[in-house]
Amino acid sequence: MEHIYQYSWIMPFIPLPVPMLIGVGLLLFPTTTKHLRRIWAFPTLFLLGLVMLLSAYFFILQLNKSYIYQYVWSWTINNDFSLEFGHLVDPLTSIMSILITTVGITVLIYSEKYMFHDQGYLRFFSYMTLFHVSMLGLVTSSNLIQIYICWEFVGMFSYLLIGFWFTRPVAANACQKAFVTNRVGDFSFLLGILGLYWITGSFEFRDLFEIFYNLVHNNEIPFFFLTLCAFLLFGGALAKSAQFPLHVWLPDAMEGPTPISALIHAATMVAAGIFLVARLLPLFIVMPYILNLISFIGIITVFLGATLALSQKDIKRGLAYSTMSQLGYMMLALGMGSYRAALFHLITHAYSKALLFLGAGSIIHSMEAFVGYSPEKSQNMVLMGGLIKHMPITKTSFLLGTLSLCGIPPLACFWSKDSILNDSWLYSPIFAIIACSTTGFTAFYMFRIYLLTFEGHLNVHFRNYSGKRSNSFYSISLWGNEGPKTLQKKKGFKTLLTMNNKKGVTFFCKKIDRIDSSVRNMTRLFTHFEAKNTLPYPHESDNTMLFPMVLLVLFTLFVGAIGIPFNQEDKNLDILSKFLTPSINLLHEKSNNSVDWYEFIPNATLSVSLSYFGIVIASVLYKPNYLSLTKLNLLNLFVKGGPNKIFGDRIRNRIYDWSYNRGYIDTFYAISLARGLRGFAEFTHFFDARVIDGITNGMGILSFFLGEGIKCVGGGRLSSYLLLYFDCVLLFLFISSFLYLFHF
C-alpha cells in the first residue's frame, strides 16, 4: 500500500502539460493553435479524469482502512535552517481531491460549449487547468509553506478568471476588488505562519500541532501571542471564504464567465478557506477563544448572506450571496468543533451550487440569443420569466438544486445542513435559533430566484419595463405587490394598465380564465407588435451543456447518502463518519453523545417546516404576475389603509434598501477606507510638498540670501571689515549687559 501512496505526489502535476503545450503552441504556431483550439479541451478533460480516478482509488483504500500517508523531501539551506516539501494523503485530502476533480470535469465539459465563440477560449482553458493544479497542490500540501504557495496561486488564477473579460471596466474593477480584499487575508495568513514558525520552529503539520499543544498546556509562551497567531491564520480563511467582514469581493466576482463562477463557488477558491480551517482545526481546538470567534463570524455570515440575497435582481449575484450564507454554515460548524458536519455540508453544497450556477449559465446563454451580450439584461431576473416551457431540462435541474439548497428532504443539502443545525443546539441555543431562522430566508430567496426566472411569462417583451423599483408595474416582481409610491398616487387599476400605451386594455371581462390560455395571448395585451410574427423566446441549451447538469443532478440526489446519521449499538454506520477521523469531532466529545434519529428528526422537522414556510411566502409574493393582477386590484381597494399600511410599506422598503444596497457595507468601505485613504494620501502629499520640502528649500533659500548679504558687506575694503567687527562687538556687549541687569 505504501508503494502506491508514494506516487500520490504526481496528482497535482498530471494536468499541467496542457497549459504548457498551449503556451508553446501560441508562441510557435499561433494560427494553427487557435484554429485547432477545440482539440485542447479533450486532453484537459482526459488528464483531469485521470486525477479523479487516482483520487477515487485513494478514497477507496482509505475507506477500507484509514491510513494517513506523508512523504517529505528535506532541502537543507544551512545547518540551522531547512525547508521540507512533501505531500500528505489523508481522509481530508481524498475528499477534497474527489470534490475538485468531479466538479471540475463537469464545469470543463460545460465550458467547452459555453465558451465556444469566445476569442479567449484557449486562455480560459489554460487558466482553468492551472486553477485545478493549484487547488490540488493546496489540498495535498504537507506543511504551511506549501499551502501558502499554492494558496497564492489559487488566488492569482481566480483573479485572472474573474477579470477574464478585462476589456469591460466592471470586470476589471471586480478583479481588482477581489485582489485587494484577499490581500488583507493573505497578509494576515503570512504573518500567522511566520509567528507560528517563530514559536514552534516547524512548518510541518504533525510537528506543529504537537509543539503548539505542549506550549499551550505548559504556558511556555504568552497566551495572547498564541491567540494572535491563531487569529492571523484564520484571517486568511476569512477573506478566501468570503466571511464577514471580508465578503465584499464575492458578489462582484460574478463578472467572470459563469463556468468559473460555478467552480469558484463550488469546489475551489471559497472552499480553500474552509479546507484551511479544517486542516488547522487540531491547532484551533486548544484555543477556545478562536473557536468561539470562528463560530461567531460564521453565524453572522449565515444571517447576513441570507438577508442580502433577498432582493437581488442579478441571478448570479443572488446565488453568490447564497454561497456566502452556506459558507457561514460550514464555518459555524468548524467553530463548534463539528468537523464531520462541516465537511459534509461542503460536499453537498458543492454539487448543488455547481448545478445552480450551471443552470444560471444555461439561462444566461439562452437570454443572450435575443437580448444580446449585456449582463445587465441577460442576468436580470426581472426581465426573465416563462422559461419553464422553453427550457424544461434546465428548469428541472435548477428546481432540484433549489430544493436541495432549501434543505428539502431527501436531497443532499438537507442531511448536511440539518447535521449542522442539530449540533448548533448542543453548542448555543441562540446560534441555533439564528441558524434555523435563516433556513426560512434561504428557502424564500431561492424560490424567489426560481419563480422570477421560470414561472409566469417572458417579461422582456413588455414595452413599459423599467429596471427602477419605482416603476408602477414591475415593483410587483420585487416584493410581490405594488410599491408604496404607486399606491399613494391613487391611480386606478385601469389607469395602471394603460400607462404609456396608445390604447387602453380591458382586463376584466366575463371569461377571466382565458388569461391563462397561451403565452401569445398573454403577451399580446402588453406588447406592441411591429409585425404579426411572434417574438423570439429563449431555447434549451445544447446537449453538451445539459449533460454536466444531469450528472450534477445525480450527485444532488444521492450524495447525501454518505452522511445519513444511522446509529446502532453505538456505531456510526454512515460512510462519512467511518471515513473521517472520529477523534477530531470536538463537539460530540464534549457532549458525550452521538447524534441519532431521536434527536435528528425533531430538529429536522423544525428546519423543514421553516423552509416550507419560506417557500410558501415566496410563492404568494412571486407567483406569475398575470395571475396576481386580480390580487393587485384588490390591493387598490385598500389604498387608504391608514397608518398601519404606510408603516408596513416603510418597513418593507427599509428591508429592501438594506438588502439591495448590500447592507451598506460596500458604501461604508468606500467612504471610510477608500476615501479615508485617499484623503490621507492627499494630506501626506501636502505635508511632503509643503512642509518637508518647504523646510529643505527654505534652508537653501536662507543660505542663499545670507551668502548674498555677506557678499555685499565684504567688498574688499579694510574699513568695511572693521565696521562690521565693531558692530558685532557692540551687539554682543548689549546682549550681555541686558542679561546681567535682568538676572537671566
Curated annotation (Swiss-Prot):
Pfam family, one: Proton_antipo_N
Localization per record: Plastid, Chloroplast thylakoid membrane
Keyword NAD in annotation: yes
InterPro entries for the chain: NADH_UbQ_OxRdtase_chlpt_su5_C (IPR002128), NADHpl_OxRdtase_5_subgr (IPR018393), ND/Mrp_TM (IPR001750), NU5C-like (IPR003945), Proton_antipo_N (IPR001516)
Primary residence: plastid
GO molecular function: NADH dehydrogenase (ubiquinone) activity; quinone binding
Record-annotated disulphide pairs: none
Enzyme Commission no: 7.1.1.-
Keywords associated with the record: Chloroplast, Membrane, NAD, NADP, Plastid, Plastoquinone, Quinone, Thylakoid, Translocase, Transmembrane, Transmembrane helix, Transport
Reactions mediated catalytically: a plastoquinone + NADH + (n+1) H(+)(in) = a plastoquinol + NAD(+) + n H(+)(out); a plastoquinone + NADPH + (n+1) H(+)(in) = a plastoquinol + NADP(+) + n H(+)(out)
GO annotation terms (biological process): ATP synthesis coupled electron transport; electron transport coupled proton transport
Membrane-related topology note: Multi-pass membrane protein
Spans traversing the lipid bilayer: 9-29, 41-61, 89-109, 125-145, 147-167, 185-205, 219-239, 258-278, 280-300, 327-347, 354-374, 396-416, 425-445, 546-566, 600-620, 722-742
Annotated GO CC locations: chloroplast thylakoid membrane
Assembly: NDH is composed of at least 16 different subunits, 5 of which are encoded in the nucleus.
PANTHER family: NADH-UBIQUINONE OXIDOREDUCTASE CHAIN 5
Role this protein plays: NDH shuttles electrons from NAD(P)H:plastoquinone, via FMN and iron-sulfur (Fe-S) centers, to quinones in the photosynthetic chain and possibly in a chloroplast respiratory chain. The immediate electron acceptor for the enzyme in this species is believed to be plastoquinone. Couples the redox reaction to proton translocation, and thus conserves the redox energy in a proton gradient.
Family: Belongs to the complex I subunit 5 family.
Protein name: NAD(P)H-quinone oxidoreductase subunit 5, chloroplastic
Organism: Pelargonium hortorum (Common geranium)
Gene: ndhF
